[in-house]
UniProtKB/Swiss-Prot annotation:
InterPro entries: NA-bd_OB-fold, Rib_uL2_dom2, Ribosomal_uL2, Ribosomal_uL2_arc_euk, Ribosomal_uL2_C, Ribosomal_uL2_CS, Ribosomal_uL2_dom3, Ribosomal_uL2_RNA-bd_dom. Part of the 50S ribosomal subunit. Forms a bridge to the 30S subunit in the 70S ribosome. This is Large ribosomal subunit protein uL2. Keywords: Ribonucleoprotein, Ribosomal protein, RNA-binding, rRNA-binding. GO terms for cellular component: cytosolic large ribosomal subunit. Belongs to the universal ribosomal protein uL2 family. One of the primary rRNA binding proteins. Required for association of the 30S and 50S subunits to form the 70S ribosome, for tRNA binding and peptide bond formation. It has been suggested to have peptidyltransferase activity; this is somewhat controversial. Makes several contacts with the 16S rRNA in the 70S ribosome. It comes from Methanococcus maripaludis (strain C7 / ATCC BAA-1331). Disulfide bonds: none annotated.
């Protein structure tokens, strides 16, 4: 009898494939969208900068004027002790949070809300930023890092600047163990062994005197879970 495939183990939800969110510092999102932000602004002070396991960017603990504390994504150039502003009348400065409708065209932004008050959903990885392209009646167009232009509500908030931690890809891992530990913080199993490199008991493509599939790579959508590898329910395969 063969062994379970990686996809079967992942679906079972074993600890190896569960994201260790209990190690995170907490929810990283904007404060509630209250009248203080809608009518003016509120000041906050960066009291600490923290490393959040599994996140590619550092987070800052910010204490606001009403003694509320939040974890926020910080831009490049922010340090402990600096003040940030949140609200419709905030200054256009890195780290400040404003509605998209109040941010001029061409300004880099990140941690963009898709619905006003959702806390920020888009452009949150280290070194990423989007651009405000244009404003129109009831909508703002933002160009995302992928090149896709998204139409958003002008009341959606965003942070001015570029997410910190942009140089992380310039330093190589050097050792395989370091990469393993880095990806395990996100529940990504690494290294990934090819099916043809396995034994026959471990994978449908395993075994043989040399590495080859030995069978068609197309399988039915209704085939058994232990055989569902390759091109699943493919209409066609190969180059056009």
């Amino acid at each position: 009898m063969g062994k379970r495939l990686i996809s079967q183990n992942r679906g079972r939800g074993t600890p190896k494939y569960r994201s260790p969110t209990h190690k995170r510092k907490g929810a990283v999102k904007y404060r509630s969208y209250d009248e203080m932000e809608k009518d003016g602004k509120i000041l906050g002070t960066v009291v600490d900068i923290l490393h959040d396991p599994g996140r590619s960017a550092p987070v800052a603990k910010v204490r606001f004027a009403n003694d509320e504390e939040r974890l926020v994504l910080i831009p490049e150039g922010i340090q402990v002790g600096e003040e940030i502003e949140c609200g419709i009348s905030a200054e256009i400065k890195p780290g400040n949070v404003l509605p998209l409708g109040e941010i001029p065209e061409g300004i880099p932004v990140y941690n963009i809300e898709t619905i006003p008050g959702d806390g920020g959903k888009l452009v949150r990885s280290g070194g990423c930023y989007a651009h405000v392209v244009s404003h129109d009646v009831g909508k703002t167009i933002v160009k995302l890092p992928s090149g896709f232009s998204k139409v958003l509500n002008p009341a959606c908030r965003a942070t001015v600047g570029v997410v910190a931690g942009g140089g992380r890809k310039e330093k190589p891992f050097v050792k395989a163990g370091k990469k393993h530990h880095s990806l395990s913080a996100k529940a990504i199993a690494w290294p990934k062994v090819r099916g043809v490199a396995m034994n026959a008991v471990d994978h449908p493509y395993g075994g043989g005197r040399h590495q080859h599939l030995g069978k068609p790579s197309s399988v039915s959508r209704h085939t058994s879970p232990g055989r569902k590898v390759g091109h699943i329910a493919s209409r066609r395969t190969g180059r056009k």
